[in-house]
Amino acid sequence: MAKNIQAIRGMNDYLPGETAIWQRIEGTLKNVLGSYGYSEIRLPIVEQTPLFKRAIGEVTDVVEKEMYTFEDRNGDSLTLRPEGTAGCVRAGIEHGLLYNQEQRLWYIGPMFRHERPQKGRYRQFHQLGCEVFGLQGPDIDAELIMLTARWWRALGISEHVTLELNSIGSLEARANYRDALVAFLEQHKEKLDEDCKRRMYTNPLRVLDSKNPEVQALLNDAPVLGDYLDEESREHFAGLCKLLESAGIAYTVNQRLVRGLDYYNRTVFEWVTNSLGSQGTVCAGGRYDGLVEQLGGRATPAVGFAMGLERLVLLVQAVNPEFKADPVVDIYLVASGADTQSAAMALAERLRDELPGVKLMTNHGGGNFKKQFARADKWGARVAVVLGESEVANGTAVVKDLRSGEQTAVAQDSVAAHLRTLLG
């Protein structure tokens, strides 16, 4: 017997019982995006490796440890995308979408990072990202955050997520802060773990993200990034906070929030939860006004965010069990008796024409009425349409409400209208 081939560790199959809730959540997200005027862009999952090295930063964990990089048959270095922003910017530059234009874009799809798989963190994971180009004021930053807050309300999880904000200022302000932070860390080098010692010179702001309790205690006395901000960044952040307060969106300023990718400036934010254990970040983003120019385009202000769908699904299931997947089937067509199958299939096609959007499944594989009604129940159907030999002969069908048990004989020409009333 041949040996079974299994999925790669950290790259999961999502089976029909799971994808139904994903589809409902994704549909909710897309409806909100449409209400804000955002347009979908579809991007390759493989890009040239230098794109990510240049965009994300060569001394980040993503580039150093986590990327799936390989050489193709032409000798080119390619990488499975670890995030979506770099590819979106590349596409915008390549297709002339960005210079002197406003763009509000979103994308959805799989990303890849070689991490230790655990609940809410996988090697293949799915993100929905939004990117806005050509707008530099705090109002668009606020709109993106308002959009995410509307998602949480639609999904019934608002009480379980908290917004954290910070401003990391301009490149020059961060350079000044970097020098002060390195000087502080050098004075306390003996209290740093090996990872922080390495980061201290390559990417010192990442030390602020350390989960080591001793390092966190040390950082209580470290210089604060907010003290080094340039005046424009201060004004931008104050404007953002004022807009969020006007919109009734609560937030906490987290001076240690810096984000893990090098391209950010000014606004950074995260929506976090206490309901998923250690994997607390649900959605995160910020400004990256220098990235378009860094990747070969003309200077273009930009802001965006990404959200991990695996974590979002886990959170919705954990805190809002009333948010159910849509039923697989609305109507189940039961047929029993000689020569009823062709009549049943013809009626099913007519109903699909007359009731667009309604999910109708026809029984196949035979079985008596009891077995067929059991199948209807298994698929979650609300209504059964029954054809037996007498119904075929009379040009009628029996429509049965599977919740109340009530049933009515209806002329086949009137079945669609009757179903429309039953299904609302």
Curated annotation (Swiss-Prot):
One of its GO terms (molecular function) is ATP binding. Keywords: Aminoacyl-tRNA synthetase, ATP-binding, Cytoplasm, Ligase, Nucleotide-binding, Protein biosynthesis. PROSITE patterns: AA_TRNA_LIGASE_II. It catalyses: tRNA(His) + L-histidine + ATP = L-histidyl-tRNA(His) + AMP + diphosphate + H(+). The keyword Transit peptide does not apply. Homodimer. This is Histidine--tRNA ligase. It comes from Escherichia coli O17:K52:H18 (strain UMN026 / ExPEC).
